[in-house]
A protein has these predicted regions:
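Membrane-interface loops
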Residues: 48, 84-85, 92-168, 173
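Alpha-helical transmembrane segments of multi-pass membrane proteins, especially transporters
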Residues: 51, 55, 103-108, 176, ...
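Alpha-helical transmembrane segments of multipass membrane proteins
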Residues: 26, 30-31, 111-115, 180, ...
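C-terminal ends of transmembrane alpha-helices
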Residues: 33-36, 116-126, 179-190
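Membrane-embedded catalytic cores of phosphoryl/pyrophosphoryl-handling enzymes
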Residues: 131-247
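Hydrophobic, aromatic-rich alpha-helical transmembrane segments
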Residues: 12-21, 67, 97, 101, ...
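Alpha-helical membrane-inserting segments
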Residues: 34, 65, 114, 118, ...
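N-terminal transmembrane-helix/juxtamembrane module of multi-pass inner/ER membrane proteins
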Residues: 1-80, 120-134
């Protein structure tokens, strides 16, 4: 039995190694980061450097940086992000495939809903070290702007990866997400840990959806179901004959 289980594991690693790497790097690690940050915020109120980073950015404020931060934070507001996500989802449904439309819509829309839920649970108060140029209300953890921008960038990156123009998403997208996150800290409405949690949570959420919508995930699930059926024939039913793997 041990030899058979070990052989099944080796076969899974060989056949599905890219998907398993995506599960580890794109899904597990971001959630580990998010859970760690959330735990520190919950138990200790945040990281020791949160306040120092805010004060350093405010000490180096400048009119040009003020305008840049306001522009970036406006671009990451829920309304324009929601409109953009809705238009992109509709476009994918018309000109691409329904799974891609579902993937993109759930990536951005789901990230926004998750953000509201986490804010209500953690209930972290916003920093109030100076009067902000654009005050924000409700709770602070995690940054919805950072999470929405990261979800948009990550989803576009996955969708465009098979195409030649993928670098048009993989370079500006992360820069946009970084810029939006910086603007929230610069304006004094979020702690750096809020932004870090928003980024990590989005990458983990979108990566999870990418895996679930991947044909390789269904192949991997079928592979392990067949293996379990061979070991536990009376407990696990085999895949149906001719069962179609979703695209």
């Amino acid at each position: 039995m041990r030899a058979s289980c070990w052989q099944n594991l080796r076969n899974a690693l060989r056949i599905h190694k890219m998907l398993l790497l995506a599960l580890l790097a794109g899904l597990v690690l971001p959630w580990v980061v998010f859970v760690h940050v959330a735990e520190v915020v919950w138990e200790a109120g945040g990281f020791a450097g949160d306040r120092q980073i805010l004060e350093w950015l405010h000490a180096h404020a400048a009119p040009a940086l003020d305008q840049l931060a306001l522009a970036l934070t406006a671009a990451g507001d829920p309304l324009p992000m929601g409109i953009l996500a809705a238009l992109a989802t509709a476009g994918l449904a018309v000109w691409s495939t329904r799974p891609q439309a579902w993937f993109f819509g759930l990536s951005v829309g789901g990230a926004m809903l998750l953000n509201v839920a986490v804010k209500a649970v953690v209930a972290r108060l916003r920093p109030a070290l100076w009067p902000s140029l654009k005050p924000a209300f409700y709770y602070s953890f995690r940054s919805g702007h950072a999470m929405g921008a990261a979800a948009l960038a990550t989803a576009l990156g996955f969708l465009l990866w098979p195409h030649r123009g993928r670098w048009l998403a993989w370079v500006p997208g992360p820069l946009f997400a970084l810029g939006v996150g910086w603007s929230r800290v610069y304006l004094g409405v979020h702690y750096p840990s809020d932004v870090l949690a928003g980024w990590a949570g989005s990458v983990g959420w979108v990566a999870a959806l990418h895996v679930l919508f991947s044909p390789g995930f269904h192949e991997l699930r079928r592979f392990w179901r067949e293996a379990l059926h061979r070991r536990l024939p009376g407990v696990v039913s085999p895949p149906r004959e001719g069962q179609r793997v979703p695209a």
